[in-house]
Amino acid sequence: MSISKYSIRFLSDKATRFVPKSGVYPKGYAVGGIHCGVKKDGKSLDLAILQNTFNKEASTAGVFTQNKFKAAPVQVSMRILKQKSGSGINSFVINSGNANAVTGSKGMKDAEEMVTVTDSVLENPKDSTLVMSTGVIGNNLPIDNILTGIPKLSLNHLGNTHQHWIDCATAICTTDTFPKLVTKQFNLGNDTYTLAGLCKGAGMICPNMATLLGFFVTDAPVSPNALQQILRYAVDRSFNSITVDGDMSTNDTIVAMANGAAGGELIDNTSSSAERFSALQTEIVDFAQQLAQLVVRDGEGATKFITLKVNDALSYKDAKSIASSIANSSLFKTAMYGKDANWGRILCAIGYADVSTDQSVIPNKTSVKFVPVDGSEPIKIIWLMVNSKKLTKIELQKYYKMKIW
């Protein structure tokens, strides 16, 4: 990672481990980030733009917060995405340091202005930009700084190099200790495609997404309906399956864009495209999980990274409910913080999980297993019924010994 005046604060152990030093990025995109004056330190990047440069017909999908106090940029982006039916959105504009949430009509006007100015500078048709904000709730944006910064960023600081992507990922950060950026290439038949993703998190992380912004872009050709279906499926199995502090924010937004710049046959959610659709969905789920794990690793005050695996549940919904019940248990969290393999607290959380039927959790057919990440034998196994033919197994995979970051 190159060092600059705005990335110096990311020189931490986690930044060294998790920030990529290089990457291969999808074709047909220009990204970047600058300091425009939202953050008050005078140097931290706080304005980012991601632009599709390949054509004006990119497919876009989005998943947004379930909080009833949706921030102004969330409301504006939801309106535009619905109005466009996921087609013809060509850019994202994001500010950090101010959430533009609970800001009334002034906040709505500011969000709309960010869209209008970005569209004008990038020569987009009207309402071709989604807008996102993250930061402090309840304060009006320094909108003049942002509207001045958008042309400066658009005309002078966009590109597709690794540093441009690092700048973009850095500019959306708030309390994060490192920028979160992942890239991968994959093959669908004879076609090679690239995915790039960036996100921010740190505090208020809980299903269904919180203080979370995330962006997936690819050069694969994907229809809007297929992209929306894949994104929702992937988010449910990644960003909606993590928790740090159990709070849900007002600004959560995960968006995806596919511009088709790498060519190939259109991927749709029809029977004729079923194989390619399934393969792409698998790639994006894996990709989303990588990004979501970075959010957990950077959770405010987090000292552990734990994966919960529920096996042999009656349904995916039940498995997720059981895992969420354990993960959000304060008693379980304190036990893990204290390095105490207190399996009783785990069973307690399983017992009050919101499952579908009385048969979803059968006490005398339930086991708990603690699994070291190095693949060695479980450090403790609790069998409540050793001779049962089929057990519901709860596995906890601990990735790091206790470490204060």
From Swiss-Prot:
The keyword Transferase applies. The record marks 210-211 as: Cleavage. Its EC number is 2.3.1.35, 2.3.1.1. Pfam families: ArgJ. Its main location: mitochondrion. It is found in: Mitochondrion matrix. InterPro entries: Arg_biosynth_ArgJ, ArgJ-like_dom_sf, ArgJ_beta_C. SUPFAM superfamilies: DmpA/ArgJ-like. One of its GO terms (biological process) is L-arginine biosynthetic process. It catalyses: N(2)-acetyl-L-ornithine + L-glutamate = N-acetyl-L-glutamate + L-ornithine; L-glutamate + acetyl-CoA = N-acetyl-L-glutamate + CoA + H(+). It is an enzyme of class 2 (transferase). Gene3D superfamilies: arginine biosynthesis bifunctional protein suprefamily, ArgJ beta chain, C-terminal domain, L-amino peptidase D-ALA esterase/amidase. Pathway: Amino-acid biosynthesis; L-arginine biosynthesis; L-ornithine and N-acetyl-L-glutamate from L-glutamate and N(2)-acetyl-L-ornithine (cyclic): step 1/1; Amino-acid biosynthesis; L-arginine biosynthesis; N(2)-acetyl-L-ornithine from L-glutamate: step 1/4. One of its GO terms (cellular component) is mitochondrial matrix. Substrate binds at residues 174, 200, 211, 300. The alpha and beta chains are autoproteolytically processed from a single precursor protein within the mitochondrion. The active site is at residue 211. Keywords: Acyltransferase, Amino-acid biosynthesis, Arginine biosynthesis, Autocatalytic cleavage, Mitochondrion, Multifunctional enzyme, Transferase. GO terms for molecular function: glutamate N-acetyltransferase activity; L-glutamate N-acetyltransferase activity. Catalyzes two activities which are involved in the cyclic version of arginine biosynthesis: the synthesis of acetylglutamate from glutamate and acetyl-CoA, and of ornithine by transacetylation between acetylornithine and glutamate. This protein may be expected to contain an N-terminal transit peptide but none has been predicted. Belongs to the ArgJ family. Heterodimer of an alpha and a beta chain. This is Arginine biosynthesis bifunctional protein ArgJ, mitochondrial.
